[in-house]
């Protein structure tokens, strides 16, 4: 079939559907582009809380381990962006290794900061609420950019890609959170700081899944209109 015998209506539909595309930047470069977000959470969270409540921040020696945690978050974001590209999905073994490394790093960097005195029962719930709310509030805007980058790549498993992005942003937030909440007991760190990360993982998975469903519905409506 050549152009001369293609039905005019079909030809117009195909021509309208053709749009120039731009190749995706590599997952690593897209993750690196979010370095300013990581720095903003690393510095902004403790500085905001110090300004708000006049708390003493962690010693400068502790900032190095937070930088390590923030750099790991970029690796996880790169994995999430790769997961979002059809045909480049991560194997289950790679996902397992990534999750284990993330958990081990979170436990290790926070193990160096716990207070020998712990938290009194009267303050436990208040500190829990403050840490979770602060981390999630600062991180939700930071999650917008990764969610948008995932949506551009047409993921086959949007929940997995979104969860990895949520994990990456959650570790970014914890890198800053631990610099002003550094004198709590280990149970507080695991429940409050770890809980904030899990909330962001869930939000990342949910947002990516919803975005793909909305895109799919829009495509169906567009196809129906053309038909």
PLM features: what roles do these ranges have?
Residues 148-227:
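Terminal transmembrane helical module of multi-pass membrane proteins
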Residues 27-122:
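Selected alpha-helical membrane-embedding segments in polytopic membrane proteins
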Residues 106-162:
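Membrane-proximal helix-loop-helix units in multi-pass membrane proteins
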Residues 68-81, 136-146, 197-210:
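Hydrophobic cores of alpha-helical transmembrane segments in multi-pass inner/ER membrane proteins
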Residues 1-31:
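N-terminal juxtamembrane cytosolic/stromal segments of multi-pass membrane proteins
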Residues 57-64, 120-133, 160-161, 186-196:
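Non-cytosolic membrane-interface motifs at loop->transmembrane helix junctions
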Residues 30-38, 134-136, 162-167:
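Select subsegments of transmembrane alpha-helices in polytopic membrane proteins
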